[in-house]
Amino acid sequence: MALSGHVLIDPARLPRDTGPELMWAPSLRNSLRVSPEALELAEREAERARSERWDRCAQVLKNRLLRVELDGIMRDHLARAEEIRQDLDAVVAFSDGLESMQVRSPSTGGRSAPAPPSPSPAQPFTRLTGNAQYAVSISPTDPPLMVAGSLAQTLLGNLYGNINQWVPSFGPWYRTMSANAMQRRVFPKQLRGNLNFTNSVSLKLMTEVVAVLEGTTQDFFSDVRHLPDLQAALILSVAYLLLQGGSSHQQRPLPASREELLELGPESLEKIIADLKAKSPGGNFMILTSGNKEARQSIAPLNRQAAYPPGTFADNKIYNLFVGAGLLPTTAALNVPGAAGRDRDLVYRIANQIFGEDVPPFSSHQWNLRVGLAALEALMLVYTLCETANLAEAATRRLHLSSLLPQAMQRRKPAMASAGMPGAYPVQTLFRHGELFRFIWAHYVRPTVAADPQASISSLFPGLVLLALELKLMDGQAPSHYAINLTGQKFDTLFEIINQKLLFHDPAAMLAARTQLRLAFEDGVGVALGRPSPMLAAREILERQFSASDDYDRLYFLTLGYLASPVAPS
């Protein structure tokens, strides 16, 4: 291609507002040569660069997918290894028990050694190692149950052994929850079992849901200064019992172990309930009444402080009862030189004697104060629901252990009858004031805490968590205006915890979801205790959502979190 030089045009011949222009014209003297080899080389280099970039992107994607797959495989291996370790611990504990039985009761005269008496939960116990088996009783009308871990999780594993003949149904709430989970776009596929599309719920989904409920009040900060909420509540209640005994607490020794602390639990709780009725302190049963949004985003004090802002618990009835009795001395009193200031703090003395010096005074490090108050309110609600009960079998009863565990129950009754154990013959079904709660405390709470000293209120009573969450949703609605919720938003927090655990693994999002669930539980317990009749409000929800029709059903629901009934598979 040829181009010419520039041509100058005379401006005089152009209009006034037109300037000179440079024009180009073709010329044979100007040419542009293009090398085919250079074009081919440039094309090859560009193709190679594109290929290398694509390979790098593909390799990065493969590495990420491989990392996710290896993470899943490692989690599965760790879970299987943990199950094997728990089984080995159970075998070791069982063999140790057999050896100790042979040492204590050797056979003589060719006769077999007499069977050792079954341990009584009311007697002092020692901590069980690993995931060892232990016996619990929920109702005096039923035989004891051997469990490993939690009662709710252990029983779940026994409900799916014969799904060809029958499957467990858990009531309207779980049926709605399962249907809502199957409709969500983001949900772990390993929880989408075939039973979720029938009248039942798959074992994996039930296991995860119950695990979330049991972990509602468990401490997730791993701070050595933090106590389990049950232990913090017991320290507060027992200290109040000793303090209100006047000078008698000076002669009565302080509890020196967790066993002694647990032994005083029912008595101290009854003392607090009686004084709340007699003294009527101001306030309500809500842990947090402040409208500050930041205060509801974290359970721990804000800005890494040890104490909450002044007036945080000023509207709580139990806190006002303790302050009025002088149970919680001020920080100024604790800072008095010498030991006299700390000696006046009965709560600190009990905590220091049982748990050591790692636990600071409740008045200065208020995490234990907060979780203790919340756990006390939860125990008060359990006590109220079990205050008077009739465990006689009703025609509308939903839970029947003889239907869920037919073979085990048939084998158990003759053995119990020959040994003279409770449950093999007619027992008491009507209980006086607080009598049933003391039975549950002695035969369920104490053995469970012996097996797991870190047991929390939610792990002991997962059904109480569900009840409180439902009461929180109904707060502010008149009984005649209860609307049918079609949105499924009440399951959002529950499913968010499951998604973070199995899919996303975001610590910040998991912390926010667990905090939201715990605050909702605390609010629900406060709403229930604030009702004129907590028993009537609880009965309505338990019957409508979980098909609990009598005191027996309600008792088992509190400790299990579900009521199973066998139905034909569809």
Swiss-Prot record:
<dbReference type="GO" id="GO:0043657">
    <property type="term" value="C:host cell"/>
</dbReference>
<keyword id="KW-0167">Capsid protein</keyword>
<keyword id="KW-0231">Viral genome packaging</keyword>
<dbReference type="InterPro" id="IPR002493">
    <property type="entry name" value="Herpes_UL25"/>
</dbReference>
<dbReference type="Pfam" id="PF01499">
    <property type="entry name" value="Herpes_UL25"/>
</dbReference>
<keyword id="KW-0945">Host-virus interaction</keyword>
<keyword id="KW-1163">Viral penetration into host nucleus</keyword>
<dbReference type="GO" id="GO:0075732">
    <property type="term" value="P:viral penetration into host nucleus"/>
</dbReference>
<feature type="region of interest" description="Interaction with major capsid protein/MCP">
    <location>
        <begin position="1"/>
        <end position="54"/>
    </location>
</feature>
<dbReference type="GO" id="GO:0019028">
    <property type="term" value="C:viral capsid"/>
</dbReference>
<comment type="similarity">
    <text>Belongs to the herpesviridae CVC2 protein family.</text>
</comment>
<keyword id="KW-1188">Viral release from host cell</keyword>
<keyword id="KW-1160">Virus entry into host cell</keyword>
<dbReference type="GO" id="GO:0046718">
    <property type="term" value="P:symbiont entry into host cell"/>
</dbReference>
<dbReference type="GO" id="GO:0019072">
    <property type="term" value="P:viral genome packaging"/>
</dbReference>
<keyword id="KW-1048">Host nucleus</keyword>
<comment type="subunit">
    <text>Heterodimerizes with CVC1. Interacts with major capsid protein/MCP and triplex capsid protein 1/TRX1 at the pentamer vertices. Interacts with the large tegument protein/LTP.</text>
</comment>
<protein>
    <recommendedName>
        <fullName>Capsid vertex component 2</fullName>
    </recommendedName>
</protein>
<dbReference type="GO" id="GO:0042025">
    <property type="term" value="C:host cell nucleus"/>
</dbReference>
<comment type="function">
    <text>Capsid vertex-specific component that plays a role during viral DNA encapsidation, assuring correct genome cleavage and presumably stabilizing capsids that contain full-length viral genomes. Participates in the interaction between the capsid and the tegument through interaction with the large tegument protein/LTP.</text>
</comment>
<feature type="region of interest" description="Disordered">
    <location>
        <begin position="102"/>
        <end position="123"/>
    </location>
</feature>
<keyword id="KW-0946">Virion</keyword>
